[in-house]
Amino acid sequence: PTTCMPDLNGPSMICRQRSLCWREGTIEERMQHALIKGIDKYITEDTEEARQHYDRCLQIIEGPLMSGMQVVGDLFGEGKMFLPQVVKSARVMKKAVAYLEPFMEEEKREAGLEGASQRGTFLIATVKGDVHDIGKNIVGVVLQCNNYKVVDLGVMVDCDTILEEAVKHNADMIGLSGLITPSLDEMVYVAREMQRLDFKIPLLIGGATTSAKHTAVKIAPTYENTVVHVNDASRSVGVVESLISDDLRDNFVTENAKKHAQLVSSYRERTQKLVPYEEAFAKRFSTDWESVTIDEPDFLGSKVLDDFPLATLREFIDWSPYFMTWELKGKYPKIFDDAVVGEVAKEVYAKANEMLDRIIDEKLIQARAVYGFFPAASDGDDILVYSDDERSQVQTRFHCLRQQWERRGQKDFRSLADYVAPVDSGRKDYIGGFVVTAGIGADELANQFKRELDDESAIVVQAVADRCAEAFAECLHQRARREWQYGQSETFSNEDLISEKYRGIRPAAGYPACPDHTEKRTLFDLLKAEKTTGVELTSSFAMTPAASVSGLYFAHPEARYFAVDRVTRDQIESYAQRKGWSVAEVERWLSPNLAYEPDNSAPDNSAPDNSAAAPTGSCPKCNCGS
């Protein structure tokens, strides 16, 4: 009867698809098989059968259920089971426990019994101003699978709430997540507050914008207890286990401190050569503005696309980042042929498309956009946007930063302003802008699945919405190039679009070519994006819904993406003067890009109140959080 019990040497799902002979096993074997294979169809009836065989419900949880999840954890740790399968297993476990909970409550009332023991309490949150939580949610599921109590505070959680809840739940450690660069400063602030309030528990740092170097150099020095950077969900289990275990903790903490010391030493000894800002500007990217072709857009001003069909966006989806969400390495579609993850990738892809079919058929999520073209001219490292093509009145201006890092063989130091004709060139030039979202309704749908104990579908919804948002940005950029005349003869395939073989770029505020997230405020005001799309900016200038993308369009024939990287104080002073901000405020928003240590001794009383942004994610060309 056990011929189709789980194959502990690998994650094959053939048995689940082709045979039910595993149903002939003992109740313990059936429950273990269901957990390992992620089959929830029979778990309720099996759990009830187990309840008839065991004296207490707690024995079921601590017996066959935890035994099955232990196998799941072991296989995951050995690389024989993958994240999508672990999430399926978690769904089975949650359904079994949910069925037992009312019976357990009754047992506790009758006998004063204790609940199931857990290995520790892990509190996790996406920090203030940040709305991205796919990675955080995955970490929570994985830790729950390993019998840790997870207190998930959600997104945009302020420091006070995080620390108050940590005390309330007697947390054994705190995990902070974030995608946008301003979240890094918020993490530093939380660490400082933990030090001030004499916390003694480890602090874990994760998210796309974080790094081991930033954690070691900026966060760890502010908190005398253990601070660990966690790369991904699969590593989180080992880190938490090492910090919880009396046998493993001391050695892990020592090795972590050594890594931090090495990273700090490497950071201080870096040899990156930066030229003065004045020299970088003198060696800027140049264009023969007399001869270059400048195309005029079909229209000036903005257009709104409401309830854009998701079916149209499907053909523009780049699926490779979707597999990265599930920690499956490989590019689409070659990943399907991978000997290790190919079969799992096929299942993940099928699930995503099933969800997308349902979203489209039932109209569960809406896509909206606003985009436009405007008369523009560069003025030094600023881009002026005019009210109309008479160009007599400046409507707004975008502030740009310039490269100062002198790389080998480098001929120029670029700024986005270089791609727009200067005021004194005698040429009429233009700039475009856009805000798109494919997330209207996505959070509500994901939360519905969470209430149904279906973490897998909740994560799929969020990840698919992110892919659709990026696809919308790609689709709209194609449309914009055609309406700007220069892209009318394009015949690119989706693979060509993903490879960016077309002319023109669409850089996003907060990413390498324009690292200042606050420039989104200018774009949103120009396009009236809150009113037209429903997309808003948080206090840290993250976009909500999270499945949103925004940026500028540049049509220059030689425009390409680049990284500003680190900048010196002389450029920061110029930038602050142009924005009308204090140097200290600019330093705060651009702290990851500073090539020097700012003077934080004096309070900054002249900084703008960024809470006013509230009423209003990653690849370098967008802000989708991918």
PLM ranges: what are they?
Residues V71-F76, M194-A216, L300-I335, V567, ...:
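Amphipathic alpha-helical packing elements
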